[in-house]
Structure formats: structure tokens, C-alpha cells
Amino acid sequence: MNPRLFSPHIIRSLLDLDAYKINMMQAIHHFYPDVSVRYELIVRSEEDASGLLDAIRQEIAHLGTLRFSDADIHYLTQHAPHLKATFLQSLRYFHFVPQEQVEMGIVKQGGKQQLRISIRGSWRDTILYETLVMAIVSEVRSRQRWAEVPADLPLKVLKTKLDQLKAEIERRGINNFSLTEMGTRRRFSSQVQRDVLACLKQEIPQWVLGTSNYHFAREFDLKPIGTIAHEWFMGHQALVNERDSQQVALERWLTAFDGMLAIAPTDTLTIDAFLNDFNRHLANAYDGVRHDSGCPFRWGDKMIAHYQQLGIDPTTKLFIFSDGLDFDQALELCEYFAGRVKISFGIGTFLTNDLANWRNAAGVEYRPLSIVIKLAECQGRPVAKISDQPEKAMCEDPIFLANLKRRFNIELDVDALIQELRHQKRSPRHYISAA
């Protein structure tokens, strides 16, 4: 194991996660302390990750040994003023119980094998797993299958990008670029993310707002940044009337944080369904919105028109773009929306897991593993993410999905629904290994 790329334990602090997970944990602690949930890992890549199972199991078991330290609580008290004292005190008693909460194995579906990770338990006690487990899966894969990557390559790639970024910003006279590093979940390794943040802070401090990772925010004295994720909205589909779920989620988030952290993702259902619920009260109360799927230019135009229709000056609002961005796309968006709205970027894999088409000795080109962990059930009921990008949609129950679309006047492809029902009947998931 190359110590310049990897460390013996992947996760060594419970703060080594995305800040929005702890934010949502507080809201759940307040509103839904007894709600049960199930999460599922989804491997979007064609690559079979089942061979990583044993090493992943060991790393997830290690999570059970970690606790929030006094220093962790003190840091959050000082740098996360939106977190209430009573909630922070409750973190002192928090710990994972992986042997009860996490089921791992290999699923056989359609004649192929794939890694399966299922997380179950109370929402409050399991919500922090997502970022940690994704980082574990990504790094185990890196050290088992791509250990021969030159240790200096990730930083070389990044520095080339930063040189090009600085030159383009100067050449084009762009003055509205800023970014938050959001690369924890799909990073090549923890050490690479550390090196990336050190490089960003040294090379472009004027454009780096902070990082979504509490652990590295503390280490590099950066601002920890995070608001809310699709999960909050998905859970409400099972907790209130489906048609009211989006508005209730938006309202309760404002209540949970007294109006702070008011940046809303718009694509849990689709941008059009979101705008139908994003009334003048909510549009005023929220500082801005986040784009995570679909065409960002059309999305931004639609959001600006919505604010104008409500009589709200869009230049007072913030648009955050976080959908698989690179610097070229970000600068195009800077130019397109200049003077029309405040913008910023959440950039992840492009920073923490890009090896610039590097190939191993066998000639295989490196590609990051595309994975997500998403809420599948809440209180034993299915939930869904529809998205503005079909490949990002997810729901285990096609009947529930069809009903949800009907309730929100989202177009339903009946032929696709019939095909999915036939496919589920023909090819149910078959678990051939579990622990």
C-alpha cells in the first residue's frame, strides 16, 4: 500500500463526511427521532465491484469504533452555529452499530454479480453512513485495483487544471467564479483529497469558499459548507401526503434552522414540480437553489423567470451548480449568468478523483467508480427521486413512482412502466452472499 496515496484505515474521524449529513441529522433529531429507513448502494458503472466485499466489510466494521470526540464537538460548536447545543450534546453518545445496521453481500441480477450494501435502522442513527460508506467503497477499489497509479499524478493533473483556470479567468475577465470542494464521497482516497485541498488553498485561495468536509475544513482552516440533500425531500414522501411532501419539507427545514442553510435542491421530483410548490413565501425565505441535474442553462433561465414572475429580484438570490462540473463548464455558466444572479459551484470528482485518462500496464484507462447511496424506504414505504436527468432517477417501486408522478403532474411513460413491472417479475434480485 502506497502511504502517499492510502492510509491503513480509510475513515479515522466521524467528521470526515459531507456537512449536510450532520445538518439533516439535526433536523431529523428534532422532527423524526423514531422514523425508520433503508438505504441502498447503487453502482452505476458497469464494473463488477463484488470482489471488494471483504475489504469493505472490514472498513465498515471499523466505523463502529469511532466516536465524536470532545474536540469534534468543540469544533462544531465554534464553526457550525446552526447546530443547536442540545443536538451537539447528543452526538457525544452517538455510535454506529454496523453489525446490526449494515447488510453486505453480492446481488445477482440479470446474470451479473454486483456489490450490495443495504443500511437499515432509525433515520437518526443511520443517516451518517452514506458519505462514509461511499468513500470507503471508492478508496477500497482504488487501493485494490489501481494501486500502481503514480503517487504524484493526482496533484499533477490538478495543477495543470488550475493553471488553465487562472489563465482563462484572466483572459475572459470573469469575476463571478467561486467554488466549494465537494469531493468526499467519490474521492480516489482520503490522502488525495487532503492533497487537493492543500493545493487549492495555496493556488487559488481567492476562489475557494470552503469544503463540504468538516474534518478537512478543520485541518485546513476552511469554511465548512453544506445545506440540504434530496434525502430530506424523499423521506417526506412517506411521512406526509405525497402531494404536500415537497412544501412540508421546505417549510420544516426553515423551522429546523431558523431560516439558515436556506439553499434548496430543485430536482428531487423535477424542476417544474419544484416551481409549482416554490411559492412567493418560500422563494423569499430561501437564499437560493441548487442545480444537480438537467441542462444548467435552461434550469437557470427557468429559475430566474420564476423569481421575476413572483416579483423577486433574482440578483438577490444564489444559484449553486453541483452536477458533475468541470472548470470549462463552470466558466461558461459564469459568463452566461453574469449580472443576472449570484452563482457558485460545488465541484467534487473533477477535483478529487481525476487521473486524466491514465492507463495501467494492461492498457485499461482509469475511470472513477460511479456510485450513489440513496434512501429506498422510509417507515416501510417506498420513496423516489425523479430528477431532471433520467439516469439519475431512482425508485424500487414502479407503482409508487407512477402514482407520485400523477400527483405532481409529471409525464408518465406507461410503456416504460409496463416494461419495468415485467422486468421485476422476470428478474428479481437474488442475494447470493450476505453478512
UniProtKB/Swiss-Prot annotation:
GO biological process: NAD biosynthetic process via the salvage pathway
Pathway: Cofactor biosynthesis; NAD(+) biosynthesis; nicotinate D-ribonucleotide from nicotinate: step 1/1
Keywords annotated in UniProt: Ligase, Phosphoprotein, Pyridine nucleotide biosynthesis
Pfam families tied to this protein: NAPRTase (PF04095), NAPRTase_N (PF17767)
Cysteine pairs bridged by disulfides in the record: none
UniProt-listed SUPFAM superfamilies: Nicotinate/Quinolinate PRTase C-terminal domain-like, Nicotinate/Quinolinate PRTase N-terminal domain-like
Entry's Gene Ontology molecular function annotations: nicotinate phosphoribosyltransferase activity
Family, as annotated: Belongs to the NAPRTase family.
Name of the protein described by the UniProt record: Nicotinate phosphoribosyltransferase
Organism placement in taxonomy: Bacteria, Pseudomonadati, Pseudomonadota, Gammaproteobacteria, Vibrionales
